[in-house]
């Protein structure tokens, strides 16, 4: 759910208390009423380009102004479905009108969801749920348009003109195809929910299996403050939220061997004490042990062993750096140090928005002598979105922590003792779930 503020916050005492207010906000004349409206709005490559715009949104600061303007237009949100069209999807997928499937059903969407929208409902047994409904026909439309490699290539070459974007295109196409499949998304969400079950601060809503299909996902309704609201909280609370997001990200990588590839402010809900609920698992990258090992080795090379030459060899063997590139090892380390500056040395460090923007600008510096010799292997394309997106989130929070100490708790080769109260609580969780939680 990566557009709008994702008005998932459920602080009203009754499920439908804000329906009247939302009716005033909903522009009914702009609602998509039929499957043909969906095809007209998101067909002829517009849906694919929107998805690429969303996936590439984290590189805005690294692009030239003309490319930035194009990317901004691609990120425009899609009009909501009319209540009748959304209901027709529920009928097709769940076998009956939403008012019959659910005890209560809010016909107006409470959130945008990239290629669909989210409705509040109450199940027959009284559970409050969020029902994510996909635009009818959008999966087929975008899947067909993914064959237009030439147009996709021309767009990506704006961002990385010095690189061969073939592998980048293939990875983006594969990830977009997966995001169209709500069965896969629901399975991703189940995996994350099972892994983080009982975690002291990170929560993933459970999927309601019997009410989920290829076009509908029904989950527990999550409550909490939106990101924009949480920014007004005391800095101590923002630091705790940032620590949870950081731990969630890297526990996922090293424990589940998976990344939720959409670190977007709209995908989090917050409660005091560092409690964060994580939403939307359509874009998840799973790593094999062979794909994960170079990432672990680069951490060891640069942060633990302080061995620049070994770091260079690992980059070359993993495909990030051309073999025998005519650039110094020092230049390579300086170029990629942006991803390690926060964890190379112990001690508190504040990540600011300016710093996060500088990471993007430095990494996508097309004038760098390394630009023509660097590459992003297909397996790691989404990794860069996650890294840069995470920096952007932490920067907005002006988050301060000893990121190195927290990382040492998580790195499989170190597994240091807890360095914070949250780390102590997490260690207890891991001890209780040792067979599952890495």
Enumerate the predicted regions with their spans.
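ATP-dependent phospho-/nucleotidyl transfer catalytic cores
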Residues: 72-79, 91, 139-147, 152-259, ...
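Helix-rich C-lobe and terminal helical cap/extension of kinase-like folds
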Residues: 17-22, 26-28, 32-33, 59, ...
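Long, charged, glycine-rich C-terminal linkers/tails
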Residues: 99-110, 195-216, 402-410
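Conserved beta3-strand ATP-binding lysine motif
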Residues: 132-134
């Amino acid at each position: 759910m990566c557009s709008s503020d994702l008005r998932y916050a459920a602080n009203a005492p009754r499920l439908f208390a804000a329906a009247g207010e939302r009716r005033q906000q909903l522009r009914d004349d702009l609602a998509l009423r039929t499957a043909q409206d969906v095809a007209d709005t998101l067909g002829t490559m517009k849906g694919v380009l929107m998805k690429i715009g969303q996936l590439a949104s984290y590189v805005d600061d690294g692009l030239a102004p003309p490319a930035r303007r194009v990317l901004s237009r691609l990120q425009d949100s899609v009009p909501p479905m009319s209540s009748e069209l959304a209901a027709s999807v529920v009928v097709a997928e769940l076998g009956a009108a939403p008012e019959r499937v659910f005890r209560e059903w809010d016909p107006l969407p409470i959130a945008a969801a990239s290629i669909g929208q989210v409705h509040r409902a109450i199940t027959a047994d009284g559970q409050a749920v969020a029902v994510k409904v996909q635009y009818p026909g959008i999966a087929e439309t975008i899947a067909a348009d993914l064959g237009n490699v030439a147009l996709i290539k021309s767009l990506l070459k704006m961002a990385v003109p010095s690189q061969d974007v073939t592998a980048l295109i293939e990875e983006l196409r594969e990830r977009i195809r997966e995001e169209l499949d709500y069965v896969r998304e629901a399975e991703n969400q189940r995996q994350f929910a099972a892994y983080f079950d009982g975690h002291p601060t990170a929560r993933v809503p459970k999927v309601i299996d019997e009410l989920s299909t290829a076009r509908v996902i029904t989950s527990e309704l999550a409550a909490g403050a939106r990101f924009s609201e949480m920014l007004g909280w005391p800095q101590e609370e923002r630091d705790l939220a940032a620590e949870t997001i950081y731990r969630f990200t890297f526990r996922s990588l090293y424990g589940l061997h998976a990344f939720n590839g959409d670190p977007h402010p709209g995908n989090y809900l917050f409660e005091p004490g560092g409690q964060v609920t994580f939403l939307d698992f359509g874009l998840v990258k799973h790593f094999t042990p062979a794909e994960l090992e170079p990432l672990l080795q680069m951490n060891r090379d640069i942060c633990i062993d302080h061995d620049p030459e070994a770091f260079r060899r690992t980059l070359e063997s993993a495909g990030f750096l051309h073999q025998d590139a005519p650039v110094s090892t020092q230049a390579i380390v300086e170029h990629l140090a942006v991803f390690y500056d926060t964890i190379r040395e112990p001690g508190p460090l504040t990540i600011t928005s300016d710093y996060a923007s500088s990471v993007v600008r430095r990494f996508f510096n097309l004038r760098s002598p390394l630009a023509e010799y660097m590459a992003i292997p297909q397996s790691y394309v989404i990794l860069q979105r996650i890294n840069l997106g995470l920096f952007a989130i932490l920067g907005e929070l002006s988050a301060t922590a000893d990121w190195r100490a927290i990382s040492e708790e998580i790195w499989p080769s170190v597994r240091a003792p807890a360095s914070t109260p949250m780390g102590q609580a997490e260690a207890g969780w891991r001890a209780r779930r040792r067979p599952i939680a890495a």
